[in-house]
């Protein structure tokens, strides 16, 4: 029996390292749900509300730094994802949202629970498209996952329920995603200028934002050498506050006077 688009989609998620899909079972997601059952290498986490699923995917991506996935069925199912997707996108974590829709034959007819996912998710995603044919789906899914990983944000792929039930078309160039771990380093001249600045001052305070999230040890070491207090932004709290003897608190939203 030929592989269905839904099975192809699940295979590609597994290949990309996705461990779970947070979603509510039913309706236009039935084919994908059944494909998860058949695959056995990925877990369908049934939540009580799609908003919870989107937040859960964002939390998983933030904790593990890997692509996480949530899904919503047609109409209110995927509309409920939007709060969690905004949170994930603003937090800079890779999340793929599968926005299932009604059948393609009903597009543009004001059919029951019809929405325009392209408009709906435009402001909270790096990639946002709808696959209307089996040929499009693997290429769009690969592009969506790569955009989420490379951009550290949300990617949305709209998948009509009737498309997931059709026979899949294998696109061998679209079966692989590539994790990226870019390292941004200042030039030697900039580092020398910073060293001169720090050496020339007696009282120094370090203020760390989300850009310092992977430099906890370096921040602690530098603050120790300079005997400088360390303040941090809301987004960098989780990365900078812990085990930091010189931290003085957070600034901005929910901040404190010491910060």
Please report, for each region that a protein language model flagged, where it lies by residue:
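N-terminal alpha/beta PP-like core and its mobile active-site loop of ThDP/TPP-dependent enzymes
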Residues: 1-259
């Amino acid at each position: 029996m030929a592989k269905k688009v839904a099975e192809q989609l699940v295979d590609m998620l597994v290949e990309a390292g996705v461990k779970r899909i947070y979603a509510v079972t039913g309706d236009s997601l039935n084919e994908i749900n059944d494909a998860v059952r058949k695959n056995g290498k990925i877990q369908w986490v049934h939540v009580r509300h799609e908003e919870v699923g989107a937040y859960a995917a964002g939390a998983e991506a933030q904790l593990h730094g890997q692509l996480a996935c949530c899904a919503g069925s047609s109409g209110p199912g995927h509309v409920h994802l939007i709060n969690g997707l905004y949170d994930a996108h603003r937090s800079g974590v890779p999340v793929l949202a599968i926005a299932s829709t009604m059948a393609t034959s009903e597009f543009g007819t004001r059919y029951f629970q019809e929405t325009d996912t392209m408009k709906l998710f435009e402001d909270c995603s790096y990639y946002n498209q709808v696959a209307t044919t089996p040929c499009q789906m693997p290429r769009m899914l690969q592009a969506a996952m790569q955009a989420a990983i490379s951009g550290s944000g949300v990617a949305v792929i709209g998948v009509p329920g009737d498309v997931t039930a059709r026979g899949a078309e294998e696109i061998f160039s679209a079966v692989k995603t590539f994790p990226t771990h870019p390292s941004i380093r200042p030039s030697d001249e900039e580092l020398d200028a910073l060293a001169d600045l720090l050496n020339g001052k007696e009282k120094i305070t370090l203020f760390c934002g989300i850009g310092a999230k992977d430099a906890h040890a370096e921040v602690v070491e530098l603050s120790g050498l300079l005997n400088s207090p360390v303040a941090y932004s809301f987004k960098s709290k989780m990365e900078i506050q812990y085990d930091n003897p010189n931290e003085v608190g957070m600034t901005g939203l929910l901040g404190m006077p010491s910060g």
